[in-house]
Amino acid sequence: MIKVKTESIQKMLNKAVKVCSLDKFSPLTILTEVKIEGGYLSITTTDTRTTFQIKEKVETTDEMRVVVDVQLLTSLVNKITTPKIGFDMNGNALVIEGNGLYYLDIGIDESGEVIKFPEIKEPAGNGTEIDFKELTRRLEIAKSSIPASFDAKEMNNYYLAAQIIASDAFKVSSVPNIESLKAKELFISRELGNILMSLGIEKGKLDYVSETNTLTIFDNDYIIQSVIGQDRENYPLEAIQSMLSSSFTYNADISKKELLDILDRALLFIKDFDRNGINLTFKKDRLSIASVEETVQEDIKYSKASVDGLVEFNALVDIKNLKEQLDVLPDDNITIFFGDNDRAIKMVQKDIIQITALLED
């Protein structure tokens, strides 16, 4: 019986399970590999495109490798209250000793062997030091423009270069990349982005092999390896960059909090047949917000504006899209650019750009 600290394996499993897509049509995604070898306990999970492994030193010379149901193991381990948990094998079962004895079926392939997980290859180089806490903060802002559906596969990605860009048919987000990644060009899936955001990684290294599109993120106790770049050839980067550089005639500064408060109230009056539409009417000294049927009307005064020659400019936008893009902005003051552009309005906060498309009347 191999003994492991309960708290340690709880933390490891609670991280590892976040990588699983739990797709019943893809068996590996509902399983985890638990391996004890060379004095280390390692736990591995995958969504088939991204594989994650976390390890910790343990005081044993015994070795073991099993593959079991990840949700069952995680739920069980989280409910065990003994200081240590024991692991052993009995035929095709993993025996766990905690408050009692528990038997979990071991995953076996057609040849009768324990199921194999994707091999994680050692990074090709030393990697680039990355501040993942700051990177994920910026990804969370860009996430506000990731499509709600998975239909347009190429759009369900983040483009990372000098800027982190995300877009769907109605929204674009552009956030400056962290300095250590600005010279690289990466195209990562929304799933990998979600994994990085959910794991709460603060530091580590990044290695990218362009020939195989293999991205490896690693530190002393974990490694994430993913194949990236799928659908890059279909990604409309030039069109998105053109939208980001679009010119507008006017701009005005307003309070994000005031605008969000109004939108929260206005949302109560939005009906299904309104297509989530909300009218933003830019006037010389204020922004007027009204529902399509004008059952709600409120104004915000500009704190600063450049509106010479403006009479009035009306923009019908999706209220939910607008709220999502505003919610993630870190500060209160925003500059909205509008006018002489029948496609969109642009919201800027320092070096963050959020673009919301106009709806047809």
Question: Language model features by range: what are they?
Answer:
Residues 1-361:
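Structural preference for solvent-exposed beta-strand-turn elements
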